[in-house]
Amino acid sequence: MATSGRLLCVCLVMGLVFESLGYLTGREKRPAENLEASVQRRWYLNRRYEVDCGGVLCQFGCCEDDRCRELGCEFMDVLSRIRSAE
């Protein structure tokens, strides 16, 4: 039991030493990288599949008779109105 207690103390001290030196752990590095990549991917996909549908931006394949159709196309219509108002 004493050996495991000493080992635990050594591990805690080593963790504090590395933290004070500024070494980043895997958990601290990955979320920011993953977040940035997912935001870029989402932006690219949204931009890539927007088409002009009678003056209204719709997702690709949503344009029918100069109006947006299918689920989610109304959201793109609202975004295009907000952008045109600016």
Curated annotation (Swiss-Prot):
Domain of life assignment: Eukaryota
GO CC, any one term: extracellular region
Localisation: Secreted
Propeptide cleavage-removed residue intervals: 22-46
Post-translational modifications: Contains 3 disulfide bonds.
GO molecular function per UniProt: toxin activity
Coarse class of the protein's main subcellular location: secreted
The protein's name: Teretoxin Tsu6.16
Organism the protein comes from: Terebra subulata
Lineage: Eukaryota, Metazoa, Spiralia, Lophotrochozoa, Mollusca
